[in-house]
């Protein structure tokens, strides 16, 4: 009578998909608007400022994440927990926890050559080793500690707990605190790096 693997896997994939979508949305499209098409520079010729651009871009990524994770969640009809739909919010927050700091990083780059390394050595290992496919408790102790520090782990755990109806208030608060903290730090960094990239 253990948990079916599909029930374990699906919420983890939901959160991990949010991470992957956000990572893409925060790299090439942002680089294009900063350096290739200079859309952001054109926007600064209007009454809006850098803060409006950064917050607006992050909000738009959030809307896209909400839509894509909602579609993915539609395939998870087997979850009957009354709070299972909140897993969509967890996946969206997971994505935003990557979008904000990656946007900040992208604004420091002169070209897209570093993005392959970001995906290969950052996003892919996080996708594989943050609890999406198997419990992080199966990792060596050092890697467990590393996993627990990542927003992916907290997003996956939060989405899974909500989807399965086993979330506890302390657990939810810990996971939310990490995700919101990373979003806030990433947003603060993005405001600085975007200003440096866009204001000459």
Each model region followed by its residue ranges:
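Short cytosolic juxtamembrane segments of multi-pass membrane proteins
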Residues: 194-200
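Short coil/turn motifs that cap or connect alpha-helices
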Residues: 49-50, 135
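Alpha-helical transmembrane segments and their short interhelical loops
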Residues: 50-120, 169-191
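Short, hydrophobic transmembrane alpha-helix segments
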Residues: 1-2
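Membrane-interfacial helix-loop-helix junctions in multi-pass membrane proteins
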Residues: 127-185
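Hydrophobic alpha-helical interface/terminus motif in multipass membrane transporters
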Residues: 30, 40-43, 75, 105, ...
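Transmembrane helix boundary and interhelical loop/hinge segments in multi-pass membrane proteins
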Residues: 21-46
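Long, hydrophobic alpha-helical segments
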Residues: 7-27
């Amino acid at each position: 009578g253990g948990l079916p693997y599909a029930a374990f896997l699906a919420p983890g994939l939901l959160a991990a998909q949010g991470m992957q979508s956000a990572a893409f949305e925060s790299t090439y499209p942002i680089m294009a608007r900063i350096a290739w098409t200079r859309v952001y520079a054109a926007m600064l010729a209007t009454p809006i400022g850098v803060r409006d651009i950064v917050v607006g871009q992050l909000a738009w990524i959030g809307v896209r994440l909400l839509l894509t994770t909602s579609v993915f969640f539609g395939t998870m009809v087997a979850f009957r927990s009354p709070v299972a739909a909140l897993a969509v919010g967890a996946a969206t927050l997971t994505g935003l926890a990557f979008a904000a700091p990656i946007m900040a990083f992208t604004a420091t780059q002169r070209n897209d050559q570093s993005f392959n390394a970001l995906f290969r050595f950052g996003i892919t290992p996080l996708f594989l080793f943050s609890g999406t496919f198997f419990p992080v408790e199966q990792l060596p102790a050092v890697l467990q500690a590393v996993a627990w520090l990542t927003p992916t782990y907290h997003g996956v755990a939060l989405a899974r707990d909500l989807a399965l109806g086993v979330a506890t208030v302390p657990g939810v608060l810990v996971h939310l605190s990490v995700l919101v903290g990373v979003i806030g730090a990433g947003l603060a960094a993005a405001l600085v790096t975007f200003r440096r990239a866009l204001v000459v």
